[in-house]
Design a protein with these regions (language model features):
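Contiguous segments within soluble domain cores/interaction surfaces
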Residues: 1-100, 105-110, 114-129
């Protein structure tokens, strides 16, 4: 998973990243980041299995407060060990609010946790002058 200020798909199928980060320093709370994106890449190196997958993304704050809960579907071709199938999912959000300094958890579940379950951390802190 990668966090960035700006991400765009290029005509040749690549992703351009600008402002990649692994923590956020904000001037005040609540924090309203103007541009907040994260990218996940999935790789499949087997020739069998599902091609349609459901993804569930949760952003969790203090006391298990859910800032975001979103579900979507993505499709992924079957691959093989010599040439794996890859898909990159770009999630852009302009409406997220971080209410206070905290290490927020991004929980990713694919196919109800059967195919994949991961948690990533993002510290959001008050900028020190």
């Amino acid at each position: 998973m990668c966090f960035a200020e700006h991400v765009r798909n290029t005509p040749d199928g690549k992703l351009d990243f600008l402002g990649v980060f692994d923590y956020m320093d904000v001037p005040e709370f609540p924090a309203y980041p103007a541009n907040f994106n994260f990218v996940m890449q999935f790789v499949k190196n087997v020739a069998v299995g599902r091609t349609e997958h459901k993804i569930h993304v949760s952003i969790i704050g203090d006391n298990d407060e859910r800032l975001i809960e979103e579900e979507s579907t993505f499709f992924m071709a079957n691959g093989n060990p010599d040439r794996p199938s890859k898909v990159s999912l770009l999630w852009q959000n302009e409406n997220i609010v971080f209410p206070k300094p905290f290490v927020y958890s991004f929980k990713i579940r694919v196919d109800d946790g059967v195919s994949l379950m991961r948690t990533h951390q993002l510290p959001v802190m008050l900028r020190q002058s």
